[in-house]
């Protein structure tokens, strides 16, 4: 979605109608892209594309498959733009992947989601759609733009590769020292409510996107004030989410601090140039394949 797209009443009403589908769309896109944040960005683009094409939608057919088709195409576009190849995809769950201290027991579907990252996009899509989302071969063929025979062949190839694949090898991704330094400084000043000090870290032309709420110049937003007014106690921390350094918002539940939401910061020339906050997307952070908290309070 473009940076200055207004969240008008009609678009927000459209989002309201597909509320139940969004977590499933995100789950699919995050496994296709290898990142819960990239996955949500792709979903956002797909939903805005769907909104613009509503006049082309045949309302006699289910809405879900139509949205999945758009989201799938956006995932493929994303992978092509990034030049993602199999070698890179095998590390997409992050270096030294560490699950939270008390990870949930994974069902078959969730386990499959984590394993398919080693597969090429078409095989990955077919396995996710069949084994996780329970689509028929006919539906899968339509979603991925293939024949039933082609979808079945991709599904069988993917399953064979997964059955023969060894345990994934943990790898180490080079840490961006500049990003790490700025994120820790950002978190420290944010937790101290040092708003003036934070503004020193942010470039004059920085962009802010609070998903589903705001998209535009940072200096035109009430971002800091919105956090300052929140009643539920919160703290920020630096964490690796799906292998990417990010800012995680921790919220206090009784005597325990729990991860609640995530924000991605982009840095150029020692200044923060873009912030994407997923605070209003509660399905994003729980979908992460790995999260390593650097300085949990």
What are these language model-derived features?
Residues 3-27, 37:
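A short, charge-rich alpha-helical start-of-domain segment used by transcription regulators
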Residues 7, 44-63, 81-84, 165-166:
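Sigma70-family region 2
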Residues 25, 29, 67, 71-79:
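Hydrophobic-face residues of short alpha-helical interaction/recognition segments
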Residues 25, 39-50, 70, 140, ...:
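Short, small-hydrophobic-rich alpha-helical interface motif
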Residues 78-102:
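Short, basic/polar amphipathic helix motif occurring as a linker/hinge flanking DNA-binding modules
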Residues 121-122, 133-150:
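Helix-turn-helix DNA-binding module
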Residues 126-127:
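A short pre-motif secondary-structure segment
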Residues 138, 148-237:
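Solvent-exposed, charged amphipathic helical/linker segments at domain boundaries
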